[in-house]
A protein has these predicted regions:
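Canonical Radical SAM [4Fe-4S] cluster-binding loop centered on the CxxxCxxC motif
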Residues: 98-145, 149
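Generic beta-strand structural signal
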Residues: 80, 92, 103-107, 115, ...
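Conserved AdoMet/S-adenosylmethionine-binding subsite of the radical SAM
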Residues: 144-154, 159-325
Length: 359
């Protein structure tokens, strides 16, 4: 089975190329793509408008991967954390954040992470491997299946995923090739048909790859900033040693995007570390010429991580300074904390400390 081509790893262009390689006309590629992500389709025999001989050929040479029997943890606030088993026995986590008008899915792009951010529980896993495009896309497919299976009276939001944020396990830009393929499938009309404005890719600042993302995708960009001076940021995020703040912010100014779009800067507030009024004023100064909005994140404390949350009154004071400087500033409502599903809390315990080299 494993030597068969997993069609969910392929973009529309690659599907067409694959079909032609099987001796079929190119239009079969469009037909096939329109079936791969339909609800409930698990076998080629179910693709009823494809020629019978073509379906048989596909069954011999290809497969449709999917996640089955996820481990579910439900939060008291409605969030659901999914644990998905991969073919090699590894596990990844994905979080559904439902609201009445939308379902946001926080997806993973790697097993573990090499960035070693000192406030993030995923860092304790080390980097294990990149996810394939199918392993990224199948997180969305599996949660769509879950939502459709729920009685209407039990659903908080719509019956499918409407928004995708790459803020789960891993640094998305360190898996750029597979990320771009996954984004193509997610936004393909014959694929999952999401709009780019509802997809956000968050990075800790892999500067050389930021422009490549902007040139090859219209997804929204979020920057995990978390400090506004190099000494503090390098302590929190070792990647800052390689790409210091001035270089990162220059890349943000140079990021290709439509005039109406803005970069989202994410800023975790850590008690006594980066939450002073002086830090807020410096943040306002440094972001002055970048089209942006700012998302303030109350820190979600985790066992073994030596940081504390900033009191809400201080977060509000920090926000006011930024708003007085004419920034759009939001305070993220932490959800899923009771099941370790909030920002920075995703990590499979059995994977912890299995360190591999940086990809």
């Amino acid at each position: 089975m494993m030597n068969k081509t997993d069609l969910r790893n392929l973009t529309q262009d690659e599907i067409t190329e694959y079909v032609v390689g099987l001796g079929q006309p190119a239009f079969r590629g469009r037909q096939l793509m329109s079936w791969l992500y339909r609800p409930g389709i698990t076998q080629f025999a179910e693709m009823t408008d494809l020629a019978k001989d073509f379906r048989k050929l596909l069954a011999e040479h290809a497969r449709l991967s999917r996640f089955e029997d996820p481990i579910l943890e439900r939060s008291s606030d409605g969030c659901v954390k999914f644990g998905f088993g991969l073919d090699d026995g590894r596990m990844i986590e994905t979080v559904l954040i439902p609201e009445p008008d939308r379902n946001t899915l926080c997806v993973s792009s790697q097993v573990g992470c090499a960035m070693n951010c000192s406030f993030c529980l995923t860092a304790t896993m080390g980097f294990i491997r990149n996810l394939q495009p199918a392993e990224i896309v199948n997180q969305v497919c599996a949660v769509d299946d879950f939502l459709r299976s729920q009685p209407e009276e039990e659903r908080i939001g719509p019956e499918k995923v409407t928004n995708v944020v790459f803020m789960g396990m891993g640094e998305p830009l360190n898996n750029l090739e597979n990320l771009l393929k996954a984004l193509s499938i997610l936004t393909e009309q014959r694929g999952l048909d999401l709009t780019n404005r509802r997809i956000t890719v968050s990075t800790c600042g892999i500067v050389p790859k930021m422009r490549l993302l902007g040139e090859n995708s219209d997804a929204n960009l979020a920057i995990s900033l978390h400090a506004i001076d190099d000494a503090t940021r390098s302590k929190l995020m070792p990647i800052n040693e390689r790409y210091p703040l001035d270089e990162l912010l220059a890349a943000c100014r140079d990021f290709p995007m439509p005039k109406r779009k803005r970069i989202m800067f994410e800023y975790i507030l850590l008690k006594g570390i980066n939450d002073s009024e002086a830090a807020a004023r410096e943040l306002a100064r440094k972001l002055r010429d970048i089209p942006c909005k700012i998302n303030l994140l109350p820190y979600n404390e985790s066992p073994g991580i030596p940081y504390q949350s900033t009191p809400m009154r201080q977060i509000l004071a920090f926000q006011k300074i930024l708003m007085d400087a004419n920034y759009s500033v939001f305070i993220r409502n932490s959800r899923g904390t009771d099941i370790s599903a909030a920002c920075g809390q995703l990590a499979k315990k059995e994977e912890a400390n299995q360190q591999n080299p940086t990809p």
